[in-house]
Amino acid sequence: MEKYSKPIRNRIVISAVVLIVFGMLTACTTDSQPEENSTMNAEEIRSFDISVPDEVLTDLNDRLALTRLPDQIPGTGWDYGTNREYLQELIEYWKDEFDWRDQEEKLNGFNHFKTAIDGLDVHFIHERSSVDGAIPLLLTHGWPGSFVEFVDIIGPLTDPEAYGGDPADAFHVVIPSLPGYGFSDKPEERGYNPERMADVLASLMERLGYERYGAQGGDWGAIIGRVLAGNYADRLIGLHSNFVLGGPPRGVADPEAGVPVAELEFRQERARAFANESAYQTLQGTKPQSLGYGLNDSPAGLAAWIVEKFHGWSDHDGDLESVFTKDQLLTNITLYWVTETITSASRIYYESRRTPPTRRVGFIEVPTGAAIFPKEISFTPLKCAEAQYNIVHWTVMPRGGHFAALEQPELLVGDLRDFFRGLR
């Protein structure tokens, strides 16, 4: 992989950037011990265990057994959407072999909590490192992902020595479920845009007693991280993103002047590829409720909608299971099913279009690290990144796509260690 770093004091911005195409742009370390209030009050932090009722799982299996798949033109693959043969195989595995209880037990091996913020119960994992001086790190997922994307990197981040790393690179890890996702409550009012979600996460970290912390994310997690860095700059040690946002520099007659040809070609290639993968944006950004009636009622439909994105946004040669196992895919999909959150999670696209931020996020002064994966859904040239962020760390990855933590955990963990090492 290519890797470049510059001292922060030089304020030198070096970056390759991933462009957010969702249209929602309108949209050093101090480590305090967490203070978890044990009394019954509005700020109480409560332990939480995942325990899906048996009847929910029985109903899921009954629905899977009654699946009615549509026809498919013979000889077609994934260009019309989710491939029927693969979906049928996935459904059979889901019904006959996938063990949610086994996955539930693994997930419950981590410390889960809930706390009320902004009128919502917010679910999160909180794993503290035993290493003195560990940096608190907020990991934020996007759509159609969830907190489960990050569970395989908790160990390497909190206990690097156990995974062949340097204990000095340790982190305390906080992984929330965004409002409307997973085991967090669903907002019951309009306007829950990325800004509002960033406020919730800032309140969560404050409640845990972390005065300063790092943030990492992709997809909506990157968007929310940018808002955090803009509105809570004094709290962030550093911002790491595998989905860096950035538009053309303002006031420049020719925004492509001086941009390397290779970057322009890569941006065009990514834009062409994503043009065939972006129908969901319009649906979820305009009529998420209508879509939800189908996806919340049919597990096969839900699986088809989600697995299409994992297939289209990841780095593989046609074999999806060369990068994700069926269990990984189905744990995430089942989480959406048992919590009935596919509709509430999709509404962020609608809200980001219709609820403008109340605070303008300008240039990000917080030191920013970028991990550029070759099969990310879009790409932004260097000059655009320089106009948006104080990027002090840039890594061009040899492989990987949109779901970096799940697809290439070792690469992401290594880059997080490298980036934050210069900020300790």
Q: Predicted regions span which residues?
A:
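C-terminal motif of bacterial Sec signal peptides marking the signal peptidase cleavage site
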Residues: 24-27
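Non-catalytic accessory segments flanking enzyme active sites
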Residues: 57-129, 328, 337, 343-358
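Glycine-rich "HGGG/HGxG" loop immediately N-terminal to the catalytic nucleophile
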Residues: 100-102, 165, 178-192, 226
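Short beta-strand element of the alpha/beta-hydrolase
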Residues: 134-142
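Conserved hydrolase catalytic core segment
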Residues: 156, 160-163, 211-259
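Conserved alpha/beta-hydrolase
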Residues: 157-183
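Conserved acidic catalytic loop of the alpha/beta-hydrolase fold
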Residues: 195-213
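C-terminal subdomain of alpha/beta-hydrolase-fold enzymes, centered on the catalytic histidine
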Residues: 284-424
